[in-house]
Amino acid sequence: MRKIPFSPPDLSQAEIDEVIKVLKSGWITTGPETKLFESRIAERCHTEKAVCLSSQTSCAELTLRILGIGPGDEVIVPAYTYTATASIIYHVGAKPVMIDCKSGSFEMDYDKMEAAINHNTKVIIPVDLAGVVCDYDRIFEAVERKKSVFNPRNELQEKFGRVIVMADGAHAFGAQWHGKMCGEIADFTNFSFHAVKNMTTAEGGAAVHRSHDGIDEEDMYKRYMLLSLHGQTKDAYQKNKVASWEYDVVDTQYKCNMTDVLAAIGVAQLERYDQMLDRRHQLIKLYNEEFKDLPVQVLNHCDENHRSSGHLYFVRFIGKDADYRNKFYNMMADHGVMCNVHFKPLPLLSAYSKRGFKITDYPNAYNMHKNQLTLPMNSTITDDEAWYVIETFKQCMKTLK
């Protein structure tokens, strides 16, 4: 029986060579390779700076802390997302406000999102699910209309003068929307380079932000550096470079820096990224063509206004329930095709249900989840393997009527 894994990393000799170069350099923790990777991320995203850390989660949490989000504040998130989007809100002591999906869509109901904005709201975290960029025109229209209720608690928030939009771009590195790159659309964007992502450093993430009047780019970068390395004023590479051991610790902070070994993987991945992204879109086009006459709903990954990062290929079985989806998942696995489900809406998870969130309050999110399946679709899949996925999918549909 054939085996089609869900999402293996696409690694070549180039990544191996870059890692070996770093290992032989004598410097393997945060240093010149991480800084090189940051500069190339910023170049790709059309931003002044990028900060590379240990995960998207650490990038997002540190962004909230830099913005001064804390007790008494509210942060709006979709109910349909992974826990990392919302757990960071609890980490900083704020309150997550969950918004249901719009009927028939994986995105938030933007009317409900706008209605939820009040004087406690400080941040909205849209999620670019599967690498498809959200409707940021609608989101920014909402925060502009609600400017009068915005209640800034510090100087940085005052500079924005409205609710801040911080994108969860964990799936969306390389996506484009109305001629802009993901990373230059929202006020802040945080990416994931986890092993299953469409570009990887094994573990890691990056924070970027678009330029804003009154915000000093270098100062913002230094804030991330302090927060990510114990509040220490010099990292090990800086101390070694200037031959000065003296440093200060200005606050009790965190430890979530990226290492040069992991950054090396990312540097090599970026060189190949356009090719990998093109391959994903070739597969999306093939799947779309083969599934167009089947009773399934798929995401729109590309049109004249946007091109996704091609991270995940969702299908929804129209008119079916979770039992059907689960049987379909198992049948695909029996034929060696490993699929996945993205995601359980947050109120279905114990961490959130015990905090009072009820899935019955989010019926659209549940309806999107109950018959959703994610097919293997990545840049390592050959044409022959893709056709096997397609043929197996069609056979399972015939069997499970």
Tell me what each language-model feature is.
Residues 1-27, 32, 248-250, 376:
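N-terminal "arm"/small-domain region of PLP-dependent enzymes with the aminotransferase-like
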Residues 17, 61, 110-118, 137, ...:
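Amphipathic, non-transmembrane alpha-helical secondary structure
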Residues 27-74, 88-90, 98, 147-151:
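Phosphate-binding glycine-rich loop
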Residues 34-39, 47-50, 123-127, 132-140, ...:
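PLP-dependent aminotransferase class I/II
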Residues 65-169, 176:
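PLP-dependent aminotransferase-like
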Residues 107-113, 179-189, 393-394:
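A short alpha/beta connector and helix-capping loop motif
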Residues 153-200, 245-249:
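Conserved active-site segment immediately N-terminal to the catalytic lysine
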Residues 171, 184-234, 260:
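Active-site PLP attachment segment
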